[in-house]
């Protein structure tokens, strides 16, 4: 089937609506929308919820941009695409809660199509979701990964293990030699076996995000926290910033295509701190995080998992 970019765009717009409505219902605060246009072609709508009852900042961005040539970040691993016109569209979101016991979450689904006269279009889907806890709860990690596994299952037994590993490999801070969080799913360059199959999988990932995240929010939102937990949360948010600015392909793509900087950097936490050579107290919950975020087979842990 010929790729239907219009159909994909309509799904993405609905997905942004659905996620914003769901997060607002949980938090009690509303998103503020900022529509924007890109001079070189395209635009989008950025929605941000600030200082809510649960979420310190939640940003849900839709963008649809197009241009006459693919940017370097997109052709680095596919040089045959150089010189093609392109369309890129997607929904990307990051949620930073107030409560340090609630993890930060990120999700993204996207579609690219590159064309030139006399040649078949080249297209692919990408996306995924990942979780960045500050204090580790095994039952949360198990739920997150089982939700990911279950949505992958209709598409093949090998899909979840493959995209889990890709997520673990991708969200890795090489300069720190540590994982960003506990991962989830990550896929890119998906264009087989056909458009309908790939589009259905992208939809499953997009729709699965709230199913994976909101039960964790509900479970942790009433936990009491203080200055110690807050300081650790702000310190660990620094890792989030480092990854996005140094390693993230999506950030590089947006900046290199002349995307809207405010929307691209919407994923940044509103407050963050760095402290030179800081080390957590041995045996503390903060020290336990480094072990908790090590790559493991979360779906195989028992149902009665407890705090790690």
Swiss-Prot record:
Could you list the residue ranges that cross the membrane? none
Important for dimerization: region residues:
240-275
- Top EC class per UniProt? oxidoreductase
InterPro entries linked: Coprogen_oxidase_aer (IPR001260), Coprogen_oxidase_aer_sf (IPR036406), Coprogen_oxidase_CS (IPR018375)
Binding residues for substrate: 92, 108-110, 258-260
What Gene Ontology biological process does one annotation of this record name?
protoporphyrinogen IX biosynthetic process
Q: Which GO terms describe its molecular function?
A: coproporphyrinogen oxidase activity; metal ion binding; protein homodimerization activity
Give the keywords, sorted: Cytoplasm, Heme biosynthesis, Metal-binding, Oxidoreductase, Porphyrin biosynthesis
Write down the chemical reaction(s) this protein catalyses. coproporphyrinogen III + O2 + 2 H(+) = protoporphyrinogen IX + 2 CO2 + 2 H2O
Q: In which pathway does it act?
A: Porphyrin-containing compound metabolism; protoporphyrin-IX biosynthesis; protoporphyrinogen-IX from coproporphyrinogen-III (O2 route): step 1/1
Residues forming coiled coils: none
Please list the residues that bind a divalent metal cation.
96, 106, 145, 175
Cofactor(s), by name: a divalent metal cation
Q: Which domain of life is it from?
A: Bacteria
Location(s) in or outside the cell? Cytoplasm
One Gene Ontology term, aspect cellular component: cytoplasm
Tell me which SUPFAM superfamilies the record gives: Coproporphyrinogen III oxidase
The EC number(s) attached to this protein equal 1.3.3.3
Where does the entry annotate site (Important for dimerization)? 175
Active-site residues per Swiss-Prot or TrEMBL entry: 106
Indicate the quaternary assembly: Homodimer.
Q: Which family does it belong to?
A: Belongs to the aerobic coproporphyrinogen-III oxidase family.
Q: What does this protein do?
A: Involved in the heme biosynthesis. Catalyzes the aerobic oxidative decarboxylation of propionate groups of rings A and B of coproporphyrinogen-III to yield the vinyl groups in protoporphyrinogen-IX.
Tell me what this protein is called.
Oxygen-dependent coproporphyrinogen-III oxidase
- Could you tell me the gene encoding this protein? hemF
């Amino acid at each position: 089937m010929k790729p239907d970019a219009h159909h994909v765009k309509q799904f993405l717009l609905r997905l942004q609506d659905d996620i914003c409505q769901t997060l607002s219902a949980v938090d009690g605060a509303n998103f503020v929308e900022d529509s924007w246009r890109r001079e070189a072609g395209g635009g989008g709508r950025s929605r941000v919820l600030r200082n809510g009852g649960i979420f310190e900042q939640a940003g849900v961005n839709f963008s649809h941009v197009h241009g006459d040539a693919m940017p370097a970040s997109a052709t680095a691993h596919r040089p045959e695409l150089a010189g093609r016109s392109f369309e890129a569209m997607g929904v990307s979101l990051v949620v930073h809660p107030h409560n340090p016991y609630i993890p930060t979450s990120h999700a993204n689904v996207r579609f690219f199509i590159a064309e030139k006269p006399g040649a078949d279009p080249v297209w692919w889907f990408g996306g995924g979701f990942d979780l960045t806890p500050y204090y580790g709860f095994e039952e949360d990690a198990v739920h997150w990964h089982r939700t990911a596994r279950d949505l992958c299952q209709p598409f093949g037994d090998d899909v979840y293990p493959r995209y889990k590993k890709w997520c673990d490999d991708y969200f890795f801070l090489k300069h720190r030699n540590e994982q960003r969080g506990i991962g989830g799913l990550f896929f890119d360059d998906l264009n087989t076996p056909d458009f309908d199959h790939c589009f259905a999988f992208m939809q499953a990932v997009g729709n699965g995000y709230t199913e994976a995240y909101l039960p964790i929010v509900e479970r942790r939102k009433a936990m009491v926290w203080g200055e110690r937990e807050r300081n650790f949360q702000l310190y660990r948010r620094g890792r989030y910033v480092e990854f996005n600015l140094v390693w993230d392909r999506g950030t590089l793509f947006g900046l290199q295509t002349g995307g809207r900087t405010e929307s691209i950097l919407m994923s940044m936490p509103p407050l963050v701190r760095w402290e030179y050579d800081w080390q957590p107290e041995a045996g503390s919950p903060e020290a336990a995080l480094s072990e908790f975020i090590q790559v493991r087979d979360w779906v195989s842990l028992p149902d009665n998992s407890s705090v790690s």
